[in-house]
């Protein structure tokens, strides 16, 4: 299981908050909520699930660096593309310059 902290998510209203939980529960790799922690079944998730997590985390301003752990050889070509809206949030400059790959 993989635990992703959603602490500090920003909501515009009660329904906005409710939609975060509903949206996450619709992602196939979702297992359960543990307070404000999103728990996934496995670190091995589909490209579609990863794209949904990227959108969800971006929408609610949840720290996106924790999504870097889902980088694989298979998704590297699109997931680590510098032109994407998530690149700077997921792969901070420190991560790239430290030689981590």
Predicted regions and their residues:
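Short, acidic/polar
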Residues: 16-21
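Extreme N-terminal starter segment of soluble prokaryotic enzymes
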Residues: 1-3
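A structural detector for beta-sheet-dominated domains
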Residues: 5-7, 41, 65
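Short, surface-exposed ligand-recognition loops at beta-strand->loop->(often short) alpha-helix junctions
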Residues: 6-15
């Amino acid at each position: 299981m993989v635990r992703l902290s959603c602490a500090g998510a920003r909501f515009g209203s009660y329904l906005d908050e409710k939609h975060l939980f509903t949206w996450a529960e619709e992602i196939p790799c979702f297992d359960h909520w543990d307070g404000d922690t999103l728990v996934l079944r496995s670190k091995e998730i589909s490209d579609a699930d990863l794209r949904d997590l990227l959108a969800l985390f971006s929408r609610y301003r949840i720290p996106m660096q924790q999504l870097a752990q889902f980088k694989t050889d298979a998704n590297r070509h699109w997931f680590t593309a510098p032109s994407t809206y998530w690149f700077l949030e997921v792969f901070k400059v420190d991560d790239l310059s430290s030689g981590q790959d």
